[in-house]
Amino acid sequence: MHSRLATARLYLCTDARRERGDLADFADAALAGGVDIIQLRDKGSAGEQRFGPLEARDELAACEILADAAARHAAMFAVNDRADIARAARADVLHLGQRDLPVDVARAITGPATLIGQSTHDRDQVSAAAIGAVDYFCVGPCWPTPTKPGRTAPGLDLVRFAADVAGAKPWFAIGGIDGVRLPEVLAAGARRIVVVRAITAADDPREAAAKLKSELLAAI
């Protein structure tokens, strides 16, 4: 699993797309375009606003859809925040925020096979993640984003810092990244990115993913 993480470049966070009812087709398209890791994150989504929070059984059902799609495309499937859901869904990856479960507690729940990542938002958090127990970390937001309302964006300076201190540990730039902004992110030193709307809001998710992946691979 660690070798797959090392080669991963494009990480997608998607909601359950309940208001559209097209999660399976969307996931297949995005993964066919080159997404390496696909994460279910429904918090703050249009579906949540319309239908309410995703209940555990429904979250597991959505996880099964993404897990099946990821397996078909030799990609990895991630769960956000919930170590119990990650274990039940046999997720490849669990992603934690700074205020979620401690990494050692989460790993005790998921078991050793599940990779664990963490969000970082300042230099101290980046430095801690670079030498800590997480398998990867995310750096940002690079720009303000509606998926994290009210959060100050540390910007590309934090990306530059991560590029200097991360060493061999995989890390991903995150927050407001799209095809237009990607060159700036690459110039700051990132070689892996997390995106949301750049693919979820695209008319052609496969094409959007393929364009991003092509630029990422060209920068290696």
From Swiss-Prot:
It comes from the Bacteria. Its EC number is 2.5.1.3. Its cofactor is Mg(2+). 2-[(2R,5Z)-2-carboxy-4-methylthiazol-5(2H)-ylidene]ethyl phosphate binds at residues 145-147, 176. GO terms for molecular function: magnesium ion binding; thiamine-phosphate diphosphorylase activity. 4-amino-2-methyl-5-(diphosphooxymethyl)pyrimidine binds at residues 39-43, 80, 119, 148. It catalyses: 2-[(2R,5Z)-2-carboxy-4-methylthiazol-5(2H)-ylidene]ethyl phosphate + 4-amino-2-methyl-5-(diphosphooxymethyl)pyrimidine + 2 H(+) = thiamine phosphate + CO2 + diphosphate; 2-(2-carboxy-4-methylthiazol-5-yl)ethyl phosphate + 4-amino-2-methyl-5-(diphosphooxymethyl)pyrimidine + 2 H(+) = thiamine phosphate + CO2 + diphosphate; 4-methyl-5-(2-phosphooxyethyl)-thiazole + 4-amino-2-methyl-5-(diphosphooxymethyl)pyrimidine + H(+) = thiamine phosphate + diphosphate. GO terms for biological process: thiamine biosynthetic process; thiamine diphosphate biosynthetic process. Condenses 4-methyl-5-(beta-hydroxyethyl)thiazole monophosphate (THZ-P) and 2-methyl-4-amino-5-hydroxymethyl pyrimidine pyrophosphate (HMP-PP) to form thiamine monophosphate (TMP). This is Thiamine-phosphate synthase. It comes from Mycobacterium marinum (strain ATCC BAA-535 / M).
